[in-house]
Amino acid sequence: MPALTYLLLAAIGASTVHSLPSQQSCNAPVTPSSFSSTSLDVVIVGGGTAGLVLASRLSESKKLQVGVIEGGYDRTNDPLIDVPNAANALGYQGAVFGNSTYDWEYTSVPQRGLGGRVLSYPSGKVLGGSSAINGLTIQRGSREDYDAWGNAFGNGPEWTFDALLPYFKRYERWHAPTLSATGDLNSDGLSAVHGTDGRISISYNNFFTGVDIPLTQAGIALGLGPTQNPDGGDDSLFPNFGASHSLDPATGNRSYAANGYYGQTERCRSNLHLLTGAVVTRIIWDKKKATKAVGVEYAVGNDKFTVKASKEVVLSAGSLRSPQILELSGVGNKTLLESLNIPVVVDIPQLGENLQEQFIAGTDFLVRDGVVTLDALGNNATFLAEQQNLYRTNKTGAFTYLSNVNAPTPIRSLVTEDQYKTMRAALDTYLASQTLTPLQIVQYNLVKQFLDGGKVATSSLLVVASGGLVSTPAAGQGYISVVSSPAHPLSRGNVHINTTDPLAYPLIDSAFLTNPWDAQATINVMKFVRRWVAKSDIIESPGTPPQAADEWSDDQWIAYLQSVLGTAHHPVGTAAMASQKLGGVVDPRFKVYGLKNVRIVDASVFPMHIGVAPSSTTYMLAEKAADAIKKDLNAY
């Protein structure tokens, strides 16, 4: 555990544990055996971001007996999850990532675009899934991103921004911002597009570090904002109020699927049954109707059990696990299944393909003396004591702080017009040399429209107000780490099984930088970052890479990118919601093509990345899926 994270927990951990109310089930404890004998209508595989939304909403109907199987355990009220700077660990390295109690600890296959590097793939191994360990960022993509779901991918008008907005608002309990980078606190536009009665709290920082206003104003001076309403369909440029997060301002704690959708009400429902610590190994099919699911098999340690589902099985195991479960059950690419001697139930060649993952590439900078960053929590005892007191008494201050400067930006705004024309011509040449799937043709045409239009965010800038992301910070110094990433990466990977062992992890190939656009675009963004932060007048000097990088060639920048690139932990797309002629896996009502009663409800159904962190969109689609399932089962 990093020293600073340990310091944070030592400062606030005990008080946090004892101050939080515990939640108790009103029902008898659920055991693997008792769950197996329960009569269920719907079995939800995965108690994560989407799965718990479904569990809560479906069990509102007394017509349904709902079961949830989650591989992790219930860790609500755990300070490593609840306190932002403990779980988030000041820049993506910390107490929950790489900790097998909280993280499945997936890894990629060696990445051919990164010289064979193997990357970690954190994924939440607790009730609430990755909503329990993510960076708490709440963002919506652009109107164009969601309109494409409905129009370009053949899902119809119910999958456009205006049609989806009510489902975004349904999950939200929005709190107006209290700070602004420009002094303008008019949030009427935001208020109009957010809900206030939902389950997940959304709020803004109540504390700014010494870098937030200068860096935002430097971006504005370069023509990149401000935007007053990034959630109304135009998500690009520097937001005036900073990034919004799933943080409850009343408690100073993370708001996530487990404490938002599995509270005391759900725990006391007699028609909602939750089993934790169990891994689903396969779907069980009707012997007479091979495409009809009648239940699932699950493992607890070395023991296996089955449970029946009289109506539906819903996979909410995430972009990396939902395809694995289907393949183990005989659904997927026929060639792969036959090579493993798995009887084929339905041949779906594109299941597990279309993996899209945003990556992060960091650069860090030493700030000038007197500029406060989160490094001061470890460097300045007076500042630490002040922030401890603020958190203990008001649940405010640095312990609730999350990255504030988060600017999805059109890359055309960050490079010269000549640079852009050269990049675009190279992209066209590369794509013309490739054999593309029908889905990829639609995706790449959309991204080219986004790029040329110069409005939709196609790159992303994120400031971590501390050092340590790229290199080890010097003692007593303050730093910032700036993350550059493609909002709509063009490299396409996949996730598949290579064994019939259901407890083995799938092979995850993100295929980072296999499309040259991703590398060229990112190094140009990193070059822009150096110009941008220098304009803010808070930087003493570049850290990593050093000042000499200003004279680097593109090849040197690409070598640096290959050495520092990491996953953003935003995998989507491996069971795309799209028409069958495009190679889609699920239909607009989340049903798997060719199967009678199996749905997928998680980020794997995104047909294309929406350019921002996927958690908000995942909550939204789960709310929408709950309505679809209730209607189809006549369970209102």
Swiss-Prot record:
Usage in biotechnology: Melleolide sesquiterpene aryl esters are cytotoxic secondary products with anti-cancer potential. Armillaridin shows therapeutic and radiosensitizing effects on human esophageal cancer cells. Armillaridin induces autophagy-associated cell death in human chronic myelogenous leukemia as well as of hepatocellular carcinoma cells. Armillaridin can also inhibit the differentiation and activation of human macrophages and thus might have potential to be developed as a biological response modifier for inflammatory diseases.
Gene Ontology molecular function terms on file: flavin adenine dinucleotide binding; oxidoreductase activity, acting on CH-OH group of donors
Cofactor dependence: FAD
Residue numbers binding FAD: 49-50, 70-71, 104, 134-137, 280, 603, 614-615
Domain of life (superkingdom): Eukaryota
Residues annotated as catalytic: 570
Name the record gives this protein: Dehydrogenase ARMGADRAFT_1018426
Species this chain originates from: Armillaria gallica
Source taxonomy: Eukaryota, Fungi, Dikarya, Basidiomycota, Agaricomycotina
